[in-house]
């Protein structure tokens, strides 16, 4: 799930308000949900990037991608 710019702006707005005057219970809950969505999005993007990496030994030119990563790539149709 991608997070929108509006959601990031709202996270920042709530953070500023929390510092300045505090948040209501509803705002604290909203902030927690938005932060969780943001972290989930970052983790998913990071995982997606890592799962497409192919590691090559500089000296030999051999594929030295870890077996666990190769298996994930096969499962996702990115390897033979």
UniProtKB/Swiss-Prot annotation:
Keyword list, A-Z: Cytoplasm
Main location as per UniProt: cytoplasm
Places the protein is found: Cytoplasm
Any GO CC annotation of this UniProt entry: cytoplasm
InterPro entries: DUF896
Pfam families referenced in this protein's UniProt entry, alphabetically: DUF896
Gene3D superfamilies membership: Helix hairpin bin (1.10.287.540)
Family: Belongs to the UPF0291 family.
Annotated protein name in UniProt: UPF0291 protein YlaC
């Amino acid at each position: 799930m991608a997070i929108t710019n509006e959601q990031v702006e709202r996270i920042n707005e709530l953070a500023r308000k929390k510092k300045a005057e505090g948040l209501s219970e509803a705002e604290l809950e909203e902030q927690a949900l938005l932060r969780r969505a943001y972290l989930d999005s970052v983790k998913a993007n990071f995982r997606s990037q890592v799962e497409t990496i192919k590691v090559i030994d500089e000296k030999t030119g051999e594929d030295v991608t870890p077996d666990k990563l190769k298996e994930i790539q096969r499962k996702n149709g990115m390897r033979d």
